[in-house]
Structures are given as structure tokens and as C-alpha cells.
Amino acid sequence: MDAARFQSQHDSLIQAAELALRTLTPAADTRPARLHAAMRYSLEAGGKRLRPVLCLAAAQAFRPAADARHAATALECIHTYSLIHDDLPCMDNSDLRRGRPSCHKAFDEATALLAGDALLPLAFALLAQGYADRPELSRRLVAELAHAAGSTLLVGGQTEDMGGLAAGADADRLEFILLGKTAAMLSAPLAMGALIGEASETDVEHCRLAGRAAGIAFQLVDDLLDGSANAAQLGKPVGADAQNGKFTYPGLHGIPATQARIQQLTAEAVDHLSACRGDTTFLRALITRMASRDR
């Protein structure tokens, strides 16, 4: 896919994701205003919008007219809630997120905690309401996202990650962290988009596995950038992993092995998408670019 065509499609998907976020979530002045202002502050902070884009693109790959806006917004709500909570002093204690003060710095810790709490049920309300006319689809989307965001994946990965190096530096534990903390929430968007696009069960699984491989690769790139980029590039403090005693792939296996694993995982993700019967050209290009990003 040539660069101009990719950029045009990517920009279009970003715009669709941003519009959905603005129109499908409560306004900042909804009572209680401070809570909703904190929610909107974090939702509208920008970022890559990677999860919504993956979901929208996957749906369109199988059915160009598919409407995945509610699912895309639900995914960003879950992702944003996890970032708000990750930044709290009791977790990563990060003052900067997406290039501006973290939610608890812009408001206060209690409001940030509650804003994250509120985004979680909002995500599932979006799935229930947005696909009410397709109850089986709604059920499957809720199940997919709940599993990805639950105690064995997203929250479980964060729990293990909080233990840092002190909890033991073994490869199995690291894989659990990578799969849970990052990969699960890149696997779910592709699977959910495929479900909305009425893909076959085989293709839904290909998308799920592609997201899993791409998600682990995404985290490994993040780990490398944490040691080499600057705060302006990343939009968050650099060197935080080392500072917080975090357990990372480069720390365990070294930089050359990390770079090789990124290439292997990216190829695996592309192969899964190539096996799908939908038009996954854009998704394959996006995942390839994710592996070589500098922010």
C-alpha cells in the first residue's frame, strides 16, 4: 500500500474515531460536571487512537459499510480508563500523559480514580446500546471486551507488572505481562471489528491472533523507546520503566533479541491478516508501520 493511500485512509479513520468519541460520550458539563470534565479531559487528550482505528478498519475490511463506531468508542473508553489508573501515584505515579498533565494532576486523585471507574461501565453501555438490534453480536462484543479487560489479561497483566523485577525475572512471567497489559487490548479491537463486519469464525480468530502478535510487538517497541526517545516524542516521561524497577523484554533478553522478536511478531501478524478473506491491506500496512514507529 503506497504511503499516500495509507495516510488518507488512516486520517479518515482517525476522524471517524474522534467524531464518535465526541458524540457518543457524555458532555463535559453533564452532572456531576467535575467528573465528566475529567473523563472528557482524558478521552480528548489525543494519542494514536490505535484501538478504535484497528476496530473500524477490521470491520470495513469484511463489510465496507459496517458501523463499528460504538465498539471503537468502547475500546477507547477502556484504554483511557486504564491509562488514568496506571498514572495514579499508587501505580506508575506518572505526571505526564499524551503530552500534558495526567488526569490526577489536572484534577485530583479521587476525581481521576472515579473518572476511570466511570469509563469502564460506559464502554459496556455503548456495546449494549449500539448493537441492541443485533443482540447476539452485542453479547459477543461484550464478552470479547470483558475478557480482554479482565483479571486474566489487562488487569492481570498490570498486577504482575506492578511487582517489577522484585517479583522475579523469568520469561514466562514476562510473556504473561506482555499478553495481558498490551496485547489483549490490541487483539480485541481486531476481533470485535471482524465480528461487526460479519467475518467467518476462522477470520475472527485470524484477526484475534494478529492483534495478539502485533500487540506484543507494540509493547516491545515501547520498551525500546522508553530507553532512547524523549518526553516530547512519547508524550510521557521517559526512562520510567527503569526508574520504577519494571520488568521489560530488553532488560531480560537485550536489544538485538528484542528487535528480532519485533520483526518475527510483525511477520506473524501480517501472515494472519493475509489469510483472511477480507481486504486487510490497510491493516497489514498499519501493523508494519507500528513496528517501526518512533513515538
Place the predicted regions along the sequence by residue.
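N-terminal amphipathic/basic leader segments beginning at the initiator methionine
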Residues: M1-P26
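Non-transmembrane, amphipathic alpha-helical segments
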Residues: R5, Q9, S42, L174-I177, ...
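Mg2+-dependent prenyl diphosphate-binding active-site environment of isoprenoid biosynthetic enzymes
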Residues: T25, D29-V270, T281-A291
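Short phosphate-binding/catalytic loops that engage adenosine nucleotides
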Residues: G278
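Short cytosolic juxtamembrane segments of multi-pass membrane proteins
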Residues: D294-R295
